[in-house]
């Protein structure tokens, strides 16, 4: 799972067991840091750009009623593959959620609720088959203790740990992935997977430019 501006998942089938033949899947779950960072900037009057370590959110109280209402929104009812971004979960979306939280909401409570919202979105997606055994987390959100705590509480039965626990620096994984994609292109191997991209068929990605 990548917890960047948007939370997205890639499901890899296990090497053995009842789900070993499950297809590779990937999709965008919903907002992560896109809403959190905007909220921090708003609550701090522009002094802060993100909630370092999730310390601010850890001090707040979660509005679970609002979270359950938000989970009923159309995007979260769509089946994968699906993709989203700040055009849906940006400033206008934050404004609406802050109105629903109330003008007198404490910043810590607002951040705690938005943080738990991201975890609830991910947990809802992971509750659907196939069963997930292990979840490796990358992106800036993996350093947010409030978010990681909420993920552990809501994704019970799933072994959850940061990507660097298996020796891959979360800050380097995208560079490694693009290097692998480039290598596959040089070998003329297909890298696009319709189960992830939603395309009609797989194919080679990128263009080779010779000097």
Where are the regions that the model predicts?
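Glycine-rich phosphate-binding loops at beta-strand->alpha-helix junctions
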Residues: 132-154
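Phosphate/pyrophosphate-binding loops at sites that engage ATP/ADP/AMP, CoA/4′-phosphopantetheine
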Residues: 123-133
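A short acidic Gly-Thr/Ser loop motif
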Residues: 2-6, 30-32, 137-145
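A short glycine/serine-rich beta->alpha loop
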Residues: 23-26, 105-106, 163-170
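Conserved ATP-utilizing enzyme core subdomain
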Residues: 25-119, 197-211
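Generic structural signal for residues in well-ordered beta-strands
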Residues: 159-160
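Glycine-rich phosphate-binding/hydrolytic loop that grips phosphoryl groups
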Residues: 112, 116, 164-211
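Short beta-strand scaffold segments in enzyme catalytic cores
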Residues: 7-12
